[in-house]
Curated annotation (Swiss-Prot):
Changing residue 63 to A: Loss of activity. Optimum pH is 5.5. Zn(2+) 2 binds at residues 115, 118, 121, 129. It comes from Linum usitatissimum (Flax). Zn(2+) 1 binds at residues 63, 85, 199. Involved in the catabolism of cyanogenic glycosides. Naturally occurring substrates are the aliphatic acetone cyanohydrin and butan-2-one cyanohydrin, which are the aglycones of the cyanogenic glycosides linamarin, lotaustralin, linustatin and neolinustatin. Can use various aliphatic ketones and aldehydes as substrates, but not aromatic ketones. GO terms for cellular component: cytosol. Homodimer. Its cofactor is Zn(2+). This is Aliphatic (R)-hydroxynitrile lyase. It catalyses: (2R)-2-hydroxy-2-methylbutanenitrile = butan-2-one + hydrogen cyanide. InterPro entries: ADH-like_C, ADH-like_N, GroES-like_sf, NAD(P)-bd_dom_sf.
């Protein structure tokens, strides 16, 4: 990213920038298509206020939760909105009270901030900051939006946010308390890699590295090997886990996991009748006691139960990283498993704190083996600087709709949306 272009769109006399963005008009309900709700439009992005940053976005990557947002299952559920929370960009301008950033810095904006002074931050045991938690209000902290558009009646209407940032736009505004710089530590990291670091890679890698605290010689089970699960495999391999057991139904992704360090793979749809995934995992462990760490990244509630059942009760930690669709937003675990030592913890962005841990993750991302794993997740071709599944916002709505449909392809691990040249 050292040689990225630094030209910016010219604001109008009020400091407003007009650019292209991907708008979600309404939730994609059963029977509806992406064309019914998703479209590329021109929007207006107001100047940053207070401690905000206005950012020229380079690219965004599509998380499974972004698809759930389109379908109306994930908070905040207000529409119309700009979707997306994974992405990387360059600071174009800053609010008057912003500190520790400058125009031209390359940043990502993970879901959680880090004040470094609340009891949670000082504990070192969590990234759930009490002052800068996940913003699910769909607006800036002051209750307003920096995004607007002109509707078909010529009226100005506001656009809501996704988790305080919204990355599916050529320019966004974000509270600087939720941003962290890439350029000082990893200036050569390609933008798509920076994008997945902001959520998917941090979530999977951090679940193994920080939450489960896997040690050399441990056994690890990973349920679901999309981009988060593959990142967990990379971490387990790097931390010298002895057994890395992956569970999924997608043979392409299981094969990728094996190529990146998994020692055993289990296709959950090809198990003998009556055998559950957790039983299959336990059978692979010494004395069939289970694994030292169990990571759930599929987002399916049944796998969350299975992940806990696969772990050594009383010793192992089961880390839940995936968000899915559950009846009344509730997940039911077997009480007996809890009573006899089941240890389940929720995870957002891998327990990675944006100031205390993210710099270390950036350094890891530059190590050849880990960088090669990120290349695999993205299907990245260094010669062309393109990803296997990539669409440019400037190609228009039809190309975007086609790309969103392709997210369900068996060999699609991560879709990248290019927003500006790099």
């Amino acid at each position: 990213m050292a040689s990225l272009p630094v030209s910016f769109a010219k604001p109008d006399k009020n400091g407003v920038i007009t650019c292209k963005a991907i708008m979600l008009k309404e939730a994609k309900l059963p029977g509806m298509s992406y064309a019914d709700t998703v479209q590329i439009i021109d929007i207006q992005v107001d100047p940053p206020q207070n401690v905000e940053l206005r950012v020229k976005m380079l690219c965004a990557s599509v998380c499974r939760t972004d698809i759930l947002t389109i379908e109306g299952f994930m908070a905040p559920t207000q529409f119309p909105k700009i979707n997306g929370h994974e992405g990387v960009g360059i600071i174009e301008s800053m609010g008057p009270d912003t500190k520790n950033f400058k125009v031209g810095d390359v940043i990502v904006a993970p879901t959680l901030g880090e004040c470094q002074v609340c009891s949670s931050c000082r504990s070192g045991r969590t990234n759930f900051c009490q002052n800068y938690g996940a913003n699910e209000s769909a607006l800036e902290p002051d209750g307003t939006s920096r995004f607007s558009y002109i509707d078909s009646d010529g009226k100005k209407k506001l656009l809501y946010y996704k988790l305080g940032c919204s990355t599916w736009t050529q320019y966004m505004v974000v509270d600087s308390n939720y941003a962290t710089k890439l350029n000082e530590i990893a200036p050569e990291l390609p933008p798509p890699h920076g994008s997945i670091l902001s959520c998917a890679f941090a979530t999977g890698y951090g679940a193994v590295w920080l939450d489960a605290a896997v040690q050399e010689g441990d056994s690890v089970a990973i349920f679901g090997v999309g981009s988060v699960g593959i990142s967990a495999v990379i971490a387990a391999k790097e931390l010298k886990a002895k057994q890395i057991i992956v569970v999924d139904r997608n043979e392409y992704k299981l094969k990728m996991a094996m190529e990146l360090g998994a020692t055993h793979c289990i296709n959950s749809e090809k198990l003998p009748e009556g055998v559950t995934p957790s039983q299959a995992v336990r059978k692979l462990t010494p004395k069939e006691v289970g694994v030292d760490a169990s990571i759930e990244s599929s987002g399916y509630d049944v796998f969350m139960n299975e992940a806990m059942k696969a772990a050594i009760h009383g010793k192992a930690k089961t880390v839940i990283t995936g968000e899915g669709i559950y009846e009344n937003d509730r997940i039911f675990f077997d009480f007996k498993d809890f009573l006899f030592g089941g240890n389940v913890v929720g995870n957002v962005t891998g327990r990675v704190r944006i100031h205390s841990d993210f710099p270390g993750l950036l350094r890891k991302a530059q190590e050849p083996v880990i960088r090669a794993g990120m290349d695999k997740i993205l299907g990245y071709d260094a010669a062309t600087m393109k990803c296997k599944y990539e669409v440019d916002i400037r190609e228009g709505t039809p190309a975007l709709l086609k790309a969103l449909e392709e997210v369900e392809n068996v060999d699609c691990v991560k879709l990248v949306i290019k927003l500006n040249d790099y």
